[in-house]
Amino acid sequence: MAKTTKYSGSQTEKNLEAAFAGESQARNKYTYFASVAKKQGFEQIADLFLKTADNEKEHAKMWFKELNGIGDTAENLLAAAEGENYEWTDMYEDFAKTAEEEGFTELAHKFRLVAAIEKHHEERYRALLRNVETAEVFKRSEIKVWECRNCGHIVVGKEAPEVCPVCNHPQSYFEIHAVNY
């Protein structure tokens, strides 16, 4: 963790980091397990895996907060971009080299493919951060098509309305309409 906390440099800090990692991993495993249970016709078991996964998510959040891991949106976007940068520039490349050295060429290739995805994630977070920092999330210098994420109302203009005229949801529900079909 990059931020300084009252735990910085202590064994307790290491324990908090381990608790966060463990709870985060457990959450993911339980969602994967729920999917298998559901496919095999065990709805109750799937539901219990998901409920437990939600509990684990909250436990992880509690420990992450102790580590000052959650900031405002701009801080979170920067932290996310930096994390993605580390993943694609260092982590996955190192993993790929090790896999190649050990003869796992297919896995090395997969590590590099995922690294390319992580690069895209970094670019996306940095673009969103620029929008937040320049107050261009809901306002642009050129005409855009804005869509309400709640009801689908379309507005054409340089900025999203303060309130959706159809469903009365706030501006925060608007995004630039994406046509990908």
Go through the PLM ranges and name each one:
Residues 1-181:
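Non-heme di-metal
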